[in-house]
Curated annotation (Swiss-Prot):
Belongs to the TRAFAC class translation factor GTPase superfamily. Classic translation factor GTPase family. EF-G/EF-2 subfamily. GTP binds at residues 63-70, 127-131, 181-184. Transmembrane segments: none annotated. It catalyses: GTP + H2O = GDP + phosphate + H(+). Its EC number is 3.6.5.-. This is Ribosome-releasing factor 2, mitochondrial. The keyword Cell membrane does not apply. One of its GO terms (biological process) is ribosome disassembly. It comes from Danio rerio (Zebrafish). SUPFAM superfamilies: EF-G C-terminal domain-like, P-loop containing nucleoside triphosphate hydrolases, Ribosomal protein S5 domain 2-like, Translation proteins. GO terms for molecular function: GTP binding; GTPase activity. One of its GO terms (cellular component) is mitochondrion. It is an enzyme of class 3 (hydrolase).
Amino acid sequence: MLLSLTFPVLRGCTGHLVNRSLQAPRWRVTWKRSYSLLQDEVKSLRTVVNPDISKIRNIGIMAHIDAGKTTTTERMLYYSGYTRALGDVDDGDTVTDYMAQERERGITIQSAAVTFDWKDYRINLIDTPGHVDFTLEVERALRVLDGAVAVFDASAGVEAQTMTVWRQAEKHQIPCVCFLNKMDKPAASLRYSLDSIKAKLKANPVLLQIPIGSGKSFTGLVDLITRQKMMWQGNALTNDGRSFEINSLQPSDDPNVLLAVSEARAALIEQVADLDDDFAELLLGEYGENFDAVPAVKLQEAVRRVTLARKGVPVLCGSSLKNKGVQPLLDAITAYLPAPNERNHDLVRWYKNDLCALAFKVVHDKQRGPLVFVRIYSGSMKAQSSVHNINRNETEKMSRLLLPFADQQIEIPSLSAGNIALTVGLKQTVTGDTIVSSKASAAAAIRRAQAEAESRSNSHSAALAGVEVPEPVFFCSIEPPTMAKQADLEHALNCLQREDPSLKVRIDPDSGQTVLCGMGELHIEIIHDRIKREYKIETHLGPLQVAYRETILQSATAKDLLDRILGEKRHVVSVELTVHPLKENSSASCDITFEEDVKAMLPADVREAVENGVQSAYLQGPVLGFPVQGVQTVIQNVRLESGTSAAMVSACVSRCMLKALKQAGGQVLEPVMALEVTVGEEHLSSVLADLSQRRGTICDIQSRQDNKILLADVPLAEMMGYSTVLRTLTSGNATFSLELSSYEPMNSQDQNILLNKMAGLT
């Protein structure tokens, strides 16, 4: 059970050292380090509300599902003194998995923000999902972080979702530290994991620790920088991991360990010298005769420079479940990952000391309404103050400011740059919005940017880059139990959409039904469950359907004339346009261009009305009414009489577009998923046979320890209920992950089958 964070007994964050060398030989020193408070003490964040920005670390934990992210987070909270008991995913009593569905399923769905202190540092930590249906949660967490910890299962190496998340981190140029978890598993392999990081992530692993023992005999680590041995005594049942012994390596230690450390440290020094010129000069200048004599502090500084430059990734190891190796990981976070002022954000410098923050998540609280997570990039945020939302052009009053501790919060008066906060009272703000102190502040930032670039007045935005929202791939209808509950359902869906932008809700124009669009079966299932649990509405879901797309096969030109009298006004507009298929990439977004003379002739408001008409037509393709992709529209002529409204222009353009799309011939595009299945060799043939019946294309079959890794491309429509089938085929001894690969044209036979199915003929 989570206890109050405001316990009156306050202690410093630094662990204390107890000398245990009384019975040791004089030349040998043994230390026992305790990294937590007494069992009945819980620390309070009120000790330091606004730490120095150099002491802040905004960190994300990311990995494949079941690699141990949440367990690692729980150990961090325990050893730093913010929880009394060790939370366990299997027991359903973790701090960061606070939604009922998360505790039942043992997976992380929403990115829970946790703030805690480690030694002299403030760590704002985000625990992100490892399931592909919740990729947006990872994306929006990474958008506001300065560093990341990638957690790997040491017996599996780099897995499918790890590669997806790693690509997201690379896009945001986030320095990373790798943690090889589950070193206690019999199949755990340090060498395999390092090779996997090199081969699959194209990263440069910088090994900082080697394990002592393997499998069940894994008892400790050796730090290659300091040459110190860390040993945890007993097992997870008898030792919570708070105390462990640190010994300097001695000649009397195991010769195999000494040899392994000597070779690994020499390799580390050589690798860092190759990656960091300053360190290479230091070695050749002062330590040319004996590289191994380089001081640990100099080596650590070089590793930090390599990490911040993203030339290499420090690799540590341990077992979070067995309470081993987490404290050194916390030390590595503070030692190697950047402070907020070490990350470059171009736009932020134009605000100088004024407030600039990004809203990266919204959750709903029944008593307090919407709670908005914000990352403060510059200036400070104060409770009971007004702030301006640049994206919505709205000024709102923020009533309260909170520090997040999973599902608990501490109220604070203000918070400075570099921190992550939770705000109450921002009712219009959604994910990706930029928050500043005032309209005047935003205008001043734009002026500074223009002066620096000596560019035109409209070439700069005062808004930070938002969060990219992926397109949904599944949809289904949702109905309330009675019409009396329709308004309640609409309110629930509005709240859930603000929390989760990857959830789309639309009204079917033909049936009038409410339609949910999501990222996968599990995503839709979780939304359905939340409506029942949190809003007490028993809804009915229709059959799950695939979100297809459409494109065109050839170019076509169409003309249209609209001549209509509304009231006493006559509206006349004529349009001519041509649509072309974008052959090089049928999955590309659509494009709109005007011929030069047309663009020069039309006023800006008419051009906007034309673009709205084209965009409206792109929403419904000519074959099945799915959204259109891979089409370029060229506007060749637009003529209208004075008094013609913008709405009539849009209507005429949309009607003309529909003609052109039909003439061009439609093609259905289906989502194709990249599938990775991990299965024992004894079940491989049955899995392959099943995939061949699902129109799957086998890309590769790899080996990982005793398992086979099957990589395939499979149409999403064929993957409905695959988890149940795979469990049956392999007696539960297989795992799989899916990721959207591309939209591909369906062959004529499959398209006809789909057309008949949609028409209700099959």
